[in-house]
Amino acid sequence: MPEKLEIKVLDGIVWASVSGRFSLENAKTFLLEILQRGRVEGINKILIDARSITTEISTIARFEFGNYLVSLNPYQTSIAIVGNEDAVWPNRFLENVLVNRAVDVKVVTEIKEALKWLTK
């Protein structure tokens, strides 16, 4: 799990910053918390900054995380995930899993790019 999760609302976007070691079970917990904050605030744009995750995330964990996100039914929500280059690749796997399941998501390496996409 990210050892630290910070959530704030700024300019109509739920900003979540996560850091520390990755654990699939804890990642599911923080994802649920982030989506719930958006629903409580009536905000359908979420930016998750995961650049401070310190461990490699396996392909199977990315797939399972994607399936869990789909199970939360975020279809009215746009989600931008910012990660380090090595976390985003290979081939934007997490993004492909989610887009193929009709989730409005973008996985990028820069906050600017995430904000541009969210405010499109």
PLM segments and residue spans:
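Amphipathic, Lys/Arg-enriched alpha-helical "gate/interface" segment within cytosolic domains
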Residues: 1-120
